[in-house]
Amino acid sequence: MQEKSKPVDNLRADAEKIITRAIAAVLPDAAVERALKGKTFLGRVYLVAAGKAAWQMAHAARACLQDNFCGGVVVTKYGHVNGEIANVACFEGGHPVPDENSLRGTDAALALTEDLTESDTVVFLLSGGGSALFEKPLLPLAELQDVTNQLLAAGADIVEINTIRKRLSAVKGGRFARHCAPAQVFAVVLSDILGDPLDMIASGPAYPDSSSCAQALDIAKRYGLHLSERAWALLAQETPKTLTNVETQITGSVRELCAAAAAACEALGYEPMILTDCLCCEAREAGSMLASIARTHARDGKNLAFLMGGETVVHLREKGLGGRNQEIALSAALGIEGLSNALVFSVGSDGTDGPTDAAGGIADGETAQLMRQKGVDAVQSLNDNDAYHALGAVGGLLKTGATGTNVNDVTVLLLRTAE
């Protein structure tokens, strides 16, 4: 007689299906195909792709762009070119700090898009990492690298870093779109920043800049940046505030990731509820919050799914191993212990979570007890920021491998009706 599966087994099987379907919906090739489906462009068509997902996006776009295609350029991270693309030159450069090869690729893109007419179109594909990879500095490269390193070392956030970068570049802050004018620019964006601020994704090469020179100067002074007179003068200059030749479409973001995960939940018989797609709290707090929701609704008699998208933070207290998604799962494990019909998983869409080979973590009502049986102190592991080893001891690590996309993270609480 075949042994009846336990509720946690069903929950884990569902979690695997949800993860697979959610990530598939935001892969670069699928995102580009959605954006270009049914689009027609008059005149000559050029392709420029920049970012960590640039090769995949360009590969998909090239299959869609047949008529009047005149050439393209890809600038992506080292190791991210996966073969030749017909009539497209591919460059690999430095990330998170630009190098000479980043500049060579950008120079090729600028040369390709020079002297265009108003009947021409530049299909511009943008993804995370574009700030470093798509660069034409208005300063010597070594000086720009030093400014970037100063900002990173000072703990500046991505918005602050990009506010500075825009003013030190000939392509950021809308300047690439202005370079392409009078040609039309059709920008397809794979967003890796919460809220999808188009002027901040890859420092907005094809979008009007909403930041001001006053803000840039304030950031530089607040972090005590050591800058040349030329750099200070550039920070005091304004960037383009209006662009009339650009159409932009966000085709992959944490919103799409959450929506796809919710659709997968619904297909599996759950009632999904997206709590937020801008999650940005402490990771362990997110885990505790979902555990509280689980205890509130565990006996509702319904199959429920609560979803959150975004990017939590981890304040390192000790030198353990883990990542924000693993820490969410470990925190949740403590809160849902004993609930036979509850499971929490959290996964990074890029397939990596912190400095580990895991994409995230998964925990159910038995996880904390299993840890004790294995001699693992879950509370101490959480305090030591050592979620990787704690979850790894009980099969709680999610490993997808590199996915080729990056649209933040998705966290899901599943509750099944007791069977």
Predicted regions, residues:
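Active-site segments that bind and position negatively charged phosphate/pyrophosphate groups
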Residues: 269-346, 354-355
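Accessory alpha-helical/coil subdomains and C-terminal extensions
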Residues: 165, 183-186, 208-289, 293
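Short beta-strand segments
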Residues: 48-50, 73-76, 123-128, 187-193, ...
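Internal helix-turn-beta structural module
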Residues: 330-419
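Glycine-rich oxoanion-binding loops at beta->alpha junctions
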Residues: 75-119, 160, 164-165
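A glycine- and small-aliphatic-rich helix-loop capping segment at beta-alpha/alpha-beta transitions
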Residues: 60-68, 87-90, 110-114, 137-150, ...
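Internal gly/pro-rich beta-alpha loop/helix module
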Residues: 140-226, 235
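N-terminal amphipathic/basic leader segments beginning at the initiator methionine
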Residues: 1-44, 48, 56, 81, ...
